[in-house]
């Protein structure tokens, strides 16, 4: 629950009775191990006098060989059964969305037996020369500068984004890619980002659990390789004031075992109705649980970045583009109840059937939206660069799964009352569109007008993390996690305590570092300079 990787190395060394040793290995060594659970963040679940915890192999994530060590991805639970990691709730959420989405897919294709959540992350970071980095106590201790002066040339010329990559940086990037490919991380894209010294990597999209693991491993690789090139990789969300910070866009979609992306429009009205079903239900989930999405991206570092004209605001909204908005507006105008055959045909041909044409030419990109539809996926843009993707993916898959369950129950009730399947789907979708309309926003998320409009719409604007963490322990959140079997009340409250404690400890470290720098670096130099000025004044007086 530190948000980073943890590892324990066990050798295959086994002494023998005759004083020699052999290498001994069997599968039982991989399945379960017993580390100390009290030494990790645990939110009070484990104490020093009751410290037992267990690791268990996660066979759904790839094992890999790092140097000469076989690495087994594992979950981590307390002796009493509570999850003490980020992987366990993620796996539970992925299982829930699999079942819920598969059930809804039965309305359209009975060959669908499994639905996978996909994730493609975009990792932003800064590279700083090691000597310059180590000369700054604040960078060493906190990962960001606490004092400093803006350079004459920052990012005002807009010439760094996609610019020529410096040779030394490129050599570091190539080795990071090489080491990543050796471990099965399919890194595909590299480029300069907006701020000087800022760069980005992005891989091929993959199954969410595997992709989350790969990102955690990738951040570790970046740090190690950067050091070999006399760089330091900065993953803090805002390492330097006055220029852009770093984020980690999470591109999310759902795909079936038959190879269909459920968030990609099809070539027929039937396939487009399936697309609309998952598209609209995702927006409804974001509307109903926007506060939890805000909590999922909260951190001390991300507080410096959200809403600062470089990242999405702290108000959770969804951008879908003007053309898809018009499609939803048409569906909203439907009369309730059964539709005539003529009306249904017109709807399928003139509204639902034209979606591929609309998306081909009219899907724009709104960089100010925290949750944007980009043609065949949703892009969750507010995740911090140093964060694990597990938090955001757990919440997103959980809320979508819960909404799909509600939607299916509503449709089944309408069908049981004698309504045809298509009529029931359209009626249920209309209800979702109306209920979630306020969370859709097409304008400038950086503007003050949006803050005023969001307040009128009843959307929360929570600019700081401590208050955002409170959304985890509301009665509604507790019920959501419990009824879907993702986290029980004890596990949820433990995470809340850990997040709050981590936030305050980071602020405390920054405060102490700032105090040390002022007392031992800034003030002595200022006094020395003051003394020099005084001496100069006295000498000038003597000359006069």
Identify the residue ranges that each predicted region occupies.
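Glycine-rich, acidic/polar active-site loops that bind/position phosphate-bearing ligands
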Residues: 1-235, 244-250, 254-497
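Substrate-recognition/cap regions that form aromatic- and gly/pro-loop-enriched pockets
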Residues: 500-544
